[in-house]
Amino acid sequence: MNHTVQTFFSPVNSGQPPNYEMLKEEHKVAVLGVPHNPAPPTSTVIHIRSKTSVPHHVVWSLFNTLFMNPCCLGFIAFAYSVKSRDRKMVGNVTGAQAYASTTKCLNIWALILGILMTILLIIIPVLIFQAHR
């Protein structure tokens, strides 16, 4: 019986460098050389904004709509506040800020007119009652 040993792998320390295939990118670098750029490397700065808080004033608008709604300002403010909230959810921050600013102005006017109407509704009957005495 003849026992011959066949090796499928070459020995590790055979004294010859292993035969590797050269990748396409390595071949390009070897042929062209490392790129030399005389200009200094430039950097790009990216400013990432944090989430901007845009108040939409839905609760304030709802309060003005339900309790003090002079000249329908509370209802209009509520419509604008819903638009502001929708723009904020979509990611349109500038549109949301514009609608929020209008909502705030309408809510302030609705509150002022509502308070004045409440005061007048209290004062006028008192004055009329005192005049009839």
From Swiss-Prot:
Extracellular domain ranges by topology: 1-57, 129-133
Topological domains, Cytoplasmic: 79-107
Membrane topology category: Multi-pass membrane protein
Superkingdom of origin: Eukaryota
An individual GO BP term: response to interferon-beta
Segments forming a coiled coil: none
Keywords assigned by UniProt, alphabetized: Isopeptide bond, Membrane, Transmembrane, Transmembrane helix, Ubl conjugation
Transmembrane segments: 58-78, 108-128
Tagged with keyword Protein biosynthesis: no
GO cellular component, one term: plasma membrane
Cross-link (Glycyl lysine isopeptide (Lys-Gly) (interchain with G-Cter in ubiquitin)): K24, K83, K88, K104
Keyword Membrane: yes
Subcellular location: Membrane
Family that this chain belongs to: Belongs to the CD225/Dispanin family.
Protein name according to UniProt: Putative dispanin subfamily A member 2d
Native organism: Homo sapiens (Human)
